[in-house]
Amino acid sequence: MQLLLIHSDYIEYETKKQTPVAEKIEESLKSGRLEEALTAFTAVESVDEANPEEAIEKAVSEIEKVAAQVKTNRIMLYPYAHLSSDLSSPKVAVQVLKGIEAALSGKYEVKRAPFGWYKAFTVSCKGHPLSELSRSIHPEGTAKAAVKPEAAGEKEEVVSEALKAEGTARSYWRILTPDGELHEVETFDLTPYPKLQQFVNYEISKSRAVERAPPHVELMRRLELADYEPGSDSGNMRYYPKGRLVKSLLENYVLDVATEFGAMEVETPLMYDMNHPTLKKYLDRFPARQYSIESDKRQMFLRFAACFGQFLMNHDMTISYKNLPLRMIEMTRYSFRKEQRGELVGLRRLRAFTMPDMHTLCEDMNQAVSQFKEQYDLCIDVLENVGIHIDDYEVAIRFTRDFYESNKELVVNMAKTVNKPVLVEMWDTRFFYFVLKFEFNFVDALAKASALSTVQIDVENAERYDISYVNADGKLERPIVLHCSPSGAIERCIYALLEKAAMETEEGKVPMLPVWLSPTQVRIVPISEKHLAFAEEVSKKLDCRVDIDDRDLSIGKKVREAGREWVPYVVVIGDKEMEEGTINVTVRAESEQNKPSKVQITPEELNARIRGEIAGKPYRKLPLAKYLSARPKFF
């Protein structure tokens, strides 16, 4: 079960139309309102069907705890399917909701909105630190266990030999410091490095199960970026116009950087023959679970990276040593991995994701090491420009012992470059196709880590795919292959930005996205209708994404809503601005919580400031109607 708990000034709803699964209700349930209440948006999930009574008991406990914290005795239970992509049957959902209502009714004033009805609702969130909380409730024994395919009525998932080997591979864990020393994890003092401590614990435990929703899940919805898609498989998302804009800007930026770096953009198929002899061998060397489908009596799998298509393309190419290093990139929309259901959450871990995947063919190991260094620096620069800095992630370096003994300087320089301790994983035996790889790992508010950028040195696949180049003597040779994702999955970049903002909010900072990624860069708020024409004039002087809040609301509410949307620049237009020709601008990046920073400048000065901030980055136009009164609500 998923709960979203909102401490509300008031919550009111009105039923509009019933769905095919709507419960029968009396007239009194067709509308409702509670003031000074805790609103519990609730999604009952399929896993709750095994023991509805346990789900009721745990939900009641969580709701009571929060009600005590916010000091309210009024509770509105509101069924909300959008909180989960794995819902229970309607019958069980109603049973659980009624059970929660009955259990709470003895101590609280409780109202329950009906299940299965389209409803108009308004909720006014109080906005204090405890006013927006989420809880994930799992029956005993399910939170940390993967769902077995046969139990879910699915085909047995395809699991590679490499993934099986990963579960049994013996790793030696060390901390590498910038001075080149390797330290035992158990004896190294991680106290000054709390995020590295969390990352080490996460990696060594290998527990990926989701126990509750991380903060970015609520943020991606409230900012109308993305949400779960109940009509698809778990781990497949929908992206609203604002989210599509952010996602496309990130995609375009990474492609621009890669092509400037010398990569050629290509496009390859989404599915491949599982029994193709070359591909089958590679499947068994890649640690991932695959989606499989049948087509024309052939068993196909959906790609989990661009390797397959690019390597098959490389096989058919005529390549000279003069062409090396040869780089190709594809923005894979989508790549697919059949991640275990219990590990899926928000944008952190998905089954369908967008991966920039670059491969570099190198003449020999010396050239591969040189390219590896360059691409390590490239990844740092890419994340820096996205808004994810060196201090925001932890570095993991993984290698075989033989490779390390021959390339210590390369490995140590990676720690020197970031100037902080890094986690090392070393193997005596090579289980995979690579001898060296690194990842930049973002550690979120729940101490869960997710890999972003990565580069790997691959010593197998040129042979496997029969990829060769003609050397200076006219003879065929095998290249060394680098795999690089300059940013990691695009969805994970959004996840990291949202999680970073959530953690900064807890530290008292004002959250925001980088200006170049903000769906609205400037919001103009006219005080009254007579100021609307001047607001339009100002908007035409701004060469950026600017919208106008023309709704019939108070100025205070308009400004607050702009703040909740993280708009970087908010311009209030009144008589003074019309008379003087300057504008009053709230600058979010310079503001503190409850202490906005304001400047009085001309529209031309504001435009120059924004153009400077977004210089060198991709640009797209406003994704929604310019006037807020013309916009629909997505969440």
Curated annotation (Swiss-Prot):
Segments for region (Catalytic): 215-514
GO MF: ATP binding; threonine-tRNA ligase activity; tRNA binding; zinc ion binding
Any one GO cellular component localisation term in the record: cytoplasm
Principal location listed in the UniProt entry: cytoplasm
Subcellular location: Cytoplasm
Cofactor binding, note field: Binds 1 zinc ion per subunit.
Keyword annotations from UniProtKB, A to Z: Aminoacyl-tRNA synthetase, ATP-binding, Cytoplasm, Ligase, Metal-binding, Nucleotide-binding, Protein biosynthesis, RNA-binding, tRNA-binding, Zinc
Pfam families found in the cross-reference section: HGTP_anticodon, tRNA-synt_2b, tRNA-Thr_ED
Positions of the UniProt region annotated as Editing domain: 1-152
Keyword flag ATP-binding: yes
Enzyme Commission code: 6.1.1.3
SUPFAM superfamilies per the UniProt record, alphabetical: Class II aaRS ABD-related, Class II aaRS and biotin synthetases
Cofactor requirements of the protein: Zn(2+)
NCBIfam families: PRK03991.1 (NF003068), thrS (TIGR00418)
Family assignment from sequence similarity: Belongs to the class-II aminoacyl-tRNA synthetase family.
Family annotation (HAMAP family): Thr_tRNA_synth
Protein name: Threonine--tRNA ligase
Biological source species: Methanosarcina acetivorans (strain ATCC 35395 / DSM 2834 / JCM 12185 / C2A)
